[in-house]
Amino acid sequence: MTFSNNFHRLETRLQSQVGRAIGDFNMIEDGDTILVCLSGGKDSYTMLSVLMALQKRAPVDFKLIAMNLDQKQPGFPEEVLPNYLKKLGVEYVIVEADTYSIVKEKVPEGKTTCSLCSRLRRGVIYRTAKELGANKIALGHHRDDIVNTFFLNMFFGGKMKSMPPKLATDNGDHIVIRPLAYCAEKDIASYARAMEFPIIPCNLCGSQENLQRKKVKEMLLEWERQTPGRIDNIFASLRNVVPSHLADTDLFDFNGLTTGLAKIGEDALFGQTAYDQAPLVFAGSHDDRIEFVRFERKPGDKSAEQAVPGEAAAN
């Protein structure tokens, strides 16, 4: 398989982003055994490929075990992943659990099955990780998934919450990591096409994509078309949270806020300009008038300032 220079740049970018996410969130440590969950889709294939590449030059020693859950969906190509993983030379396990029949039994015809299916799948994954002695579980969610989930929770759940790059399971037995947290879906799709991964369709169960999630995804794609880089900025905001400028009393002690405390960023209260602005200083007051004047710095003098008379900020 011959790759272009563009592909090598893409591969380098993905590996760099995954490496940075691993470092920023301390996702992988020496001695870890990581269960890498494979669905047969572009995201999980890319995750495994990048993790295997990074494993070869990582400063710490860790073990990867690829896992696929055969949920007994009609038409599931059972031989695709085992053949691919054997060829790849990675340790793997195929777990068989008939969650499909349970979902079909519990969910009314025509309703979305994804929520129940996800819960059942999660339980099987956790039990498998325990059985194999894996302390970390790697999932293939990427940057766009994280942003999408953020808006879903905000619009339909009234919470500022998303998929964290790293979290502990409820019972505390395992750490879940999302190594693709910094990676854009379009880059992953391009990489998967170039690598010619044997993609397994995600709609074998016959369930339709969640309508709310679909609408949010379409909204984000339209925003990105209108203003390229917007999704990057939204994701960056998830990493730059200022609790004092939100409204959650559990995150910030608004009741205890008083004068005399260190400033918490007045720019966010009154608006921040993108240009240098000469300061206005108090000049005096008389009758019903208060006057502020603008100061200008003398050329070459960073400390001295000279007033410009007659320019009042308040009339």
From Swiss-Prot:
- Locus of motif PP-loop motif: 39-44
Q: Where does [4Fe-4S] cluster bind?
A: 114, 117, 205
Q: Which InterPro entries does the record associate with it?
A: Rossmann-like_a/b/a_fold (IPR014729), TilS/TtcA_N (IPR011063), tRNA_Cyd_32_2_STrfase (IPR012089)
Q: Which cofactor does it need?
A: Mg(2+); [4Fe-4S] cluster
Q: In which pathway does it act?
A: tRNA modification
Pfam families given for it?
ATP_bind_3
The principal localisation class reads: cytoplasm
Report the Gene3D superfamilies cross-referenced here. HUPs
Q: Where in the cell is it found?
A: Cytoplasm
Per UniProt, the cofactor note for this protein states: Binds 1 [4Fe-4S] cluster per subunit. The cluster is chelated by three Cys residues, the fourth Fe has a free coordination site that may bind a sulfur atom transferred from the persulfide of IscS.
What is the reaction catalyzed? cytidine(32) in tRNA + S-sulfanyl-L-cysteinyl-[cysteine desulfurase] + AH2 + ATP = 2-thiocytidine(32) in tRNA + L-cysteinyl-[cysteine desulfurase] + A + AMP + diphosphate + H(+)
Q: Which domain of life is it from?
A: Bacteria
**One term under GO cellular component:** cytoplasm
Query: Could you state a single Gene Ontology molecular function term?
Result: tRNA binding
Q: Which residues does UniProt call coiled coil?
A: none
Q: Which UniProt keywords apply?
A: 4Fe-4S, ATP-binding, Cytoplasm, Iron, Iron-sulfur, Magnesium, Metal-binding, Nucleotide-binding, RNA-binding, Transferase, tRNA processing, tRNA-binding
Q: What is its EC number?
A: 2.8.1.-
Its family remark reads: Belongs to the TtcA family.
Q: How does it assemble?
A: Homodimer.
Its function, per the record, reads: Catalyzes the ATP-dependent 2-thiolation of cytidine in position 32 of tRNA, to form 2-thiocytidine (s(2)C32). The sulfur atoms are provided by the cysteine/cysteine desulfurase (IscS) system.
- State the name under which the record lists this protein: tRNA-cytidine(32) 2-sulfurtransferase
Q: Which organism is it from?
A: Ralstonia pickettii (strain 12J)
List the gene name: ttcA
